[in-house]
Amino acid sequence: MPIGVPKVPFRSPGEEDAVWVDVYNRLHRERLLFLGQEVDSEISNQLVGLMVYLTIEDDTKDLYLFINSPGGWVIPGIAIYDTMQFVSPDVHTICMGLAASMGSFILVGGEITKRLAFPHARVMIHQPASSFYEAPTGEFILEAEELLKLRETLTRVYVQRTGNPLWVVSEDMERDVFMSATEAQAHGIVDLVAIENTGDSA
């Protein structure tokens, strides 16, 4: 039986009694955001709205975006990326589990020097896909042109934010390229790999 979204106690400043709130609402108050699903318009709008709201609330405190996503739609992903560049606070990106396709694009969009992957995380990049086979000929041509523009946009961003030459990024985007956390660091997609806490006491 599904338990739904867990709830945790939260006491607002000046209040004596705590109230039970959705765990994500509680974490949002600490400026911690989560992309834990496929990228679509709904989650994109939620994250964009949260980033804008938290910037209005305090434009000096950093934001933290945790990513575990198989990818998703290109335009909603670009909306998240552009908002990350637009807001005043630095946006840390943290890859846990998988950041694939648009997930890796959002990961690379974090503030340079503040992009991190957990030790066993996986990252995958590739070119944007399409539903060509469903489109009539005229729409097919228009969609192919638009897809080419989107590919150029994504490639340019990866080049700019990883420091890799155009030919390397272009070659990688020809197919699905999976990377470990350390490989993603070497590739310039993340800056740091988290160190496992062994639990040893000093």
Swiss-Prot record:
Xref: Pfam families: CLP_protease (PF00574)
Taking the first listed entry, what is the main subcellular location of this protein, grouped into a coarse class?
A: plastid
Cellular component aspect of the GO annotation: chloroplast stroma; endopeptidase Clp complex
Cellular location of this protein? Plastid, Chloroplast stroma
Read off the SUPFAM superfamilies from this record.
ClpP/crotonase (SSF52096)
Please name the InterPro entries in this protein's record. ClpP, ClpP/crotonase-like_dom_sf, ClpP/TepA, ClpP_His_AS, ClpP_Ser_AS
Q: Name one GO molecular function term.
A: ATP-dependent peptidase activity
Q: Which Gene3D superfamilies match?
A: 2-enoyl-CoA Hydratase, Chain A, domain 1
Biological process according to GO:
protein quality control for misfolded or incompletely synthesized proteins
Keyword Hydrolase set for record: yes
Q: What's this chain's function?
A: Cleaves peptides in various proteins in a process that requires ATP hydrolysis. Has a chymotrypsin-like activity. Plays a major role in the degradation of misfolded proteins.
The entry assigns this protein to a family as follows:
Belongs to the peptidase S14 family.
Name this protein carries in UniProt: ATP-dependent Clp protease proteolytic subunit
In the UniProt record, the gene name given for this protein reads clpP
